[in-house]
């Protein structure tokens, strides 16, 4: 058989399937766009362009007074502190819940189905993690602002609860998806849950756990700025105050500082993940 005479197909053999799934996606997406009243062409209306131009024009000149920049530096540091303290509390919440919800660390499950008591305890902890991560940190911040008043304390507590639920869920999935033979051998030979965790699960999953934790810290910095708009302190609260006073120069300066802060957090996060990898 002369293979040199075989011509490649002139038409993609899978084109019909791609067209079908593209049309199906459009059919499913259209009702969602209608339900959300998505009308991007409104942005090009003369009134919208005029408002946008006036808003962007108010950003110049940038605010650069010494007293103002000192305040921005102070609130930026407070924002980083809020995110870091919130993540620390989130770890304190997540670690024990992870140990209780991870099936691999269940001694009663070694011989077969898990006993009734440990099973329901594990399920209760998993439901608690669902509740914690289902409520956005913005909602928690609104609640804590009413309880403890304005300031970073509300933001720290909000990040701690929401991120504690997220960390607990993902930590459990990472631990259960890794190599578990060493952990089960330790449990069968009389080791406790903590010993099995530190000497069995943790060494195999430490890099992935740390990488995800660093990523969540980066996300917490972004969230801490947003939480400031509901009174949780930090750079976001000062930005909200400047917007209410129609001081575009101050808003623009704080936006630039915020972008620089996020970029710095992203680089630190990437550096740490690279060092772990």
What name fits each language-model region?
Residues 83, 87-95, 99, 103, ...:
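Hydrophobic positions within alpha-helical transmembrane segments of bacterial inner-membrane proteins
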Residues 73-81, 122-132, 214, 218, ...:
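Alpha-helical membrane-interface segments at transmembrane helix boundaries
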Residues 211, 252-277:
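C-terminal transmembrane helix and the adjacent membrane-cytosol boundary/short C-terminal tail
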Residues 143-146, 150-201, 207-216, 267:
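Membrane-cytosol interface at the C-terminal ends of specific transmembrane alpha-helices
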Residues 146, 222-258, 277:
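Glycine-rich helix-loop "coupling/hinge" segments at transmembrane-helix boundaries
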Residues 118-158:
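Generic hydrophobic transmembrane alpha-helix motif, especially the helices
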Residues 95-103, 170-177, 181, 220, ...:
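Membrane-spanning helices that line or support transport/gating and their immediate boundary helices
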Residues 1-88, 92-96, 100-120:
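N-terminal, non-cleaved signal-anchor transmembrane helix
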């Amino acid at each position: 058989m002369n293979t040199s005479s075989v011509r490649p197909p002139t038409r993609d053999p899978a084109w019909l399937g791609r067209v079908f799934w593209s049309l199906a996606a459009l059919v499913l997406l259209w009702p969602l766009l209608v339900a959300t009243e998505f009308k991007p062409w409104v942005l090009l209306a003369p009134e919208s362009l005029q408002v946008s131009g006036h808003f962007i024009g108010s950003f110049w000149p940038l605010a650069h007074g010494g007293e103002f920049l000192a305040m921005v530096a102070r609130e930026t540091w407070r924002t980083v502190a809020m995110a870091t303290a919130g993540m620390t509390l989130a770890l304190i919440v997540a670690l024990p819940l992870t140990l209780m919800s991870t099936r691999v660390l269940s001694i009663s499950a070694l011989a077969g189905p898990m006993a009734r008591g440990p099973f329901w305890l594990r399920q209760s902890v998993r439901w608690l993690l669902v509740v914690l991560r289902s409520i956005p940190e913005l909602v928690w911040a609104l609640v804590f602002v009413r309880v403890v008043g304005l300031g970073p304390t509300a933001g720290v507590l909000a990040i701690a609860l929401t991120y504690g639920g997220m960390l607990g869920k993902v930590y459990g999935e990472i631990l259960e998806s890794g190599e578990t033979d060493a952990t089960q051998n330790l449990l069968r030979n009389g080791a406790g849950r903590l010993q099995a965790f530190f000497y069995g699960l943790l060494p195999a999953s430490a890099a992935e756990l740390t990488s995800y934790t660093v990523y969540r810290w980066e996300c917490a910095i972004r969230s801490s700025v947003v939480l400031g708009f509901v009174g949780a302190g930090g750079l976001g609260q000062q930005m909200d105050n400047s917007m209410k006073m129609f001081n575009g120069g101050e808003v623009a300066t704080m936006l630039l500082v915020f972008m620089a802060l996020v970029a710095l957090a992203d680089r630190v996060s990437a550096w740490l993940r690279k060092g772990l990898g």
